[in-house]
Amino acid sequence: MSRAPLPLRDDERLIFALDVPDRAQALEWVDRLGDSVAFYKIGMELLASGEYFQVLDELARRDKRVFVDLKFFDIPATAAAVIKRLSQWPVSYATIHGWHPAMMEACAAANSSDMRLLAVTVLTSMGRPDLAQMGIDREPVDVVVERALAAQAAGIDGVIASGQEAGPIRAATGAGFSIVCPGIRPGGPVGDDQKRTVGVAQAFADGADAIVVGRPIRLATDPQAAARAIQQEIASALAAR
């Protein structure tokens, strides 16, 4: 059975994508952002450094929440074993693929902590032509909602999905299911590899619990000011819904 969304403070609803190659750069960003960011996503690039869990430990030591975004996908027994071990670490969110119901059920059963598991639906870099190349000739929103319902039925706690699909997911799954939206573009589209993007206010108005922001903060002239501006926009969006 899916568990209720994490009880997040407003400032924890902004998750910064810590897309860096090593521990030194990761901690440099944490120092630079200070108290403007309370939640960090760490992914595959950092894993390749061999310093992944050192960074995880350091983030926890600094009272930051951690989102492990490694999109686990394997046979059910192997994926469940990974989740069982990962649940021993101070992790708030972790991603698994949302393509395999038996694997999702095994992962949900193996999670023995407060960590919330999020199923990957359709990457925000993909549109309908990309799905068609994979033999799925359907609109992304239809695939995303179908996978969200499958994840919920398997006992997974939520999904990570484009803000464009947050409303349909919330309508289909109800209030007790976590929705985390990456590909957020506070200032509108920026011409990168993200195709299905929305702004901060729209994501929360449509039911998102948290958002992931990377480049709009990382590439800003003043990253801390950019993060604080997003925090203010989140607070306004939450007050309005």
UniProtKB/Swiss-Prot annotation:
Identify one Gene Ontology CC term for this UniProt entry.
Answer: cytosol
Residues annotated as catalytic: K71
- Tell me its EC number(s), please: 4.1.1.23
Q: Which SUPFAM superfamilies match?
A: Ribulose-phoshate binding barrel
Record keywords? Decarboxylase, Lyase, Pyrimidine biosynthesis
Q: Which Pfam families match?
A: OMPdecase
Q: Which PANTHER family match?
A: OROTIDINE 5'-PHOSPHATE DECARBOXYLASE (PTHR32119:SF2)
Source organism of the structure: Stenotrophomonas maltophilia (strain K279a)
Does the keyword Lyase feature in the UniProt annotation? yes
- Which pathway does the database say it acts in? Pyrimidine metabolism; UMP biosynthesis via de novo pathway; UMP from orotate: step 2/2
What's the protein name?
Answer: Orotidine 5'-phosphate decarboxylase
Is Hydrolase tagged as a keyword? no
Q: Which GO terms describe its molecular function?
A: orotidine-5'-phosphate decarboxylase activity
Reactions catalysed, semicolon-separated, are:
orotidine 5'-phosphate + H(+) = UMP + CO2
Instruction: For this entry, list what GO says about its biological process.
Output: 'de novo' pyrimidine nucleobase biosynthetic process; 'de novo' UMP biosynthetic process
What the entry lists under PROSITE patterns is as follows: OMPDECASE (PS00156)
Briefly state the protein's biological role. Catalyzes the decarboxylation of orotidine 5'-monophosphate (OMP) to uridine 5'-monophosphate (UMP).
The record ties this protein, via InterPro entries, to: Aldolase_TIM (IPR013785), OMPdecase (IPR014732), OMPdecase_AS (IPR018089), OMPdecase_bac (IPR047596), OMPdeCOase_dom (IPR001754), RibuloseP-bd_barrel (IPR011060)
Subunit (UniProt): Homodimer.
